[in-house]
């Protein structure tokens, strides 16, 4: 065979062709992607928050401004003191099915069992002034009657008007809640804790608690707030404590202060997703009281505690009217209390 017809085999194979060059990565590309990702997450969170706020605020039942014309026409500027009228009614129609309805009687309609003015100085203090429902007042177009009658005959607007005329205190916002709604709000926070020095009961309202710090559920909290025949167990027997409606307003303030403490507590963060929509779903408010305003006031109140809350019931005394009915009327001390409320000063 002729070997010259075959090409010679090289001693070493030729080197492989060079790999294609990769484009150099631009510095900072990962950081830019991370920033864009965070911006996207923040945008989603903002829109989710806006949606949540809108959804929550949409649950509030509003009173048309044309039906609540007596509110103070000049609203305070942001950060300025603001006055609320907070009322609770005895409307039985929304009571939860598992509550004992026998404790609420047979009254049809609704009356104001709680009338409380709140003066909020953002970030500084809150003042509460309870008004007795039997306070003798002059109701426009209806003559002399008890304060809570103004709500029965003329609704929220006439009540606001009567209170402003009798006290000289401007009311900027109005909030109403009924028994059932108040109970649901309490339950949304896991109950409200009240300290009882002695066992207490009220056979009419349904209150029945042992001594010590007791966490009341919504139904029992309402029973405590409604109690007018409050009894304590001492020295082997039950004894009435007296005080009637005035003592009851003090118990109502107890609950308000304790609820405030619980909402302001860091531990309440776990309950807020339930509390906020429950609160909104169970109140009626004027159109000007936006959830944004409530949130701003709530944020300003987070730095406060019960020592920053002054509370009092308007000083009154018993009085028999010319119509033969029982009323209460302001004492000489009432003027100084009202003046302190208006000024945001400590009560005398």
Language-model regions: role of each:
Residues 1-34:
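Terminal targeting segments of Actinobacterial cell-envelope proteins
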Residues 25-123:
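Entry/capping segment at the start of metal-dependent catalytic domains
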Residues 94-96, 135, 216, 284-348:
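C-terminal solvent-exposed extensions
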Residues 103-106, 145-153, 168-173, 211, ...:
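Second-shell loop/turn segments in exported
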Residues 112-115, 144, 156-164, 179-183, ...:
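Extracytoplasmic/secreted envelope proteins and their assembly/folding machinery
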């Amino acid at each position: 065979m002729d070997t010259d017809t075959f090409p010679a085999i090289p001693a070493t194979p030729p080197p492989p062709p060079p790999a294609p060059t990769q484009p150099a990565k631009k510095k900072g590309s990962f950081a830019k992607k991370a920033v864009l990702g965070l911006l996207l997450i923040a945008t989603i969170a903002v829109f989710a928050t806006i949606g949540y706020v809108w959804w929550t605020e949409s649950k509030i039942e509003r009173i048309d401004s044309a039906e609540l014309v007596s509110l103070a026409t000049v609203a305070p500027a942001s950060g300025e003191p603001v006055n609320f009228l907070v009322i609770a009614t005895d409307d039985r129609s929304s009571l939860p099915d598992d509550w004992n309805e026998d404790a609420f009687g047979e009254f049809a309609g609704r009356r104001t069992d709680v009338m409380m003015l709140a003066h909020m100085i953002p970030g500084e203090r809150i003042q509460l002034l309870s008004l007795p429902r039997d306070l003798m007042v002059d109701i426009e177009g209806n003559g002399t009657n008890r304060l809570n009658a103004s709500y029965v005959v003329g609704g929220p607007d006439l009540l606001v008007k009567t209170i402003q005329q009798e006290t000289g205190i401007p009311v900027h916002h109005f909030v109403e809640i009924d028994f059932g709604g108040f109970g649901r709000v309490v339950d949304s926070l896991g109950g409200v804790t009240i300290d009882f020095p002695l066992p207490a009961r009220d056979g009419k309202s349904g209150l029945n608690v042992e001594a010590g710090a007791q966490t009341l559920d919504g139904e029992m909290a309402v029973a405590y707030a409604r109690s007018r025949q409050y009894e304590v167990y001492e020295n082997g027997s039950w004894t009435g404590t007296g005080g009637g409606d005035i003592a009851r307003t003090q118990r109502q303030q107890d609950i308000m202060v304790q609820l405030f403490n619980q909402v302001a507590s860091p531990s309440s963060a776990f309950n807020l997703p339930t509390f906020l929509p429950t609160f909104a779903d169970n109140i009626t408010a004027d159109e000007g009281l936006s959830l944004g305003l409530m949130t701003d006031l709530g944020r300003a109140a987070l730095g406060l505690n019960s020592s920053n809350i002054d509370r009092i019931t308007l000083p009154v005394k018993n009085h028999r009217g010319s119509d033969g009915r029982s009323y209460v009327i302001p004492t000489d001390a009432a003027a100084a209390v009202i003046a302190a409320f208006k000024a945001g000063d400590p009560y005398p």
